[in-house]
Amino acid sequence: MPTDDDLRAAGKGVQGQLWPATLNAPTGQFPAAKLAPDFFDYVQQTAFGMIWTRPNLATRDRSLITCSMLAALGHHDELRAHLAGALNAGVTREELIEAMMQVAVYAGVPAAVGALRVAADVLGTD
């Protein structure tokens, strides 16, 4: 079984793929992480260290799935970050837009429209 340090390192590796520019950013840049460091350590170990590193789905696929779920749930702040991460993981702009079409069918047009507003900011409209 991996140790906490192993999971942290694996999680940091995934986060580095998704958000390379913020990998070594000071904690103060992220007020929520400064407020609740144990929570973000937990997320790094479990979400990124355990789940994102599992076999059978590539990081790019997990990223596309995550964007779709965040869009469907209306979690726009997290969606904004994960859209940028998806691009870094190799998901194309067109794939992200197509995923929002899928969201519209299964989670409703309002959920997809809200997500597309966020996507327009992240991806641009050109």
Predicted features and spans:
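Substrate/cofactor-recognition hotspot
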Residues: 109-113
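Mid-chain, well-packed structural core segment of small domains
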Residues: 64-67, 72-97
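Amphipathic alpha-helical interaction elements
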Residues: 53, 70-71, 88, 104, ...
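Short alpha-helical scaffolding segments that buttress acidic/His motifs in well-ordered protein cores
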Residues: 43-47, 64-69, 99-104, 115
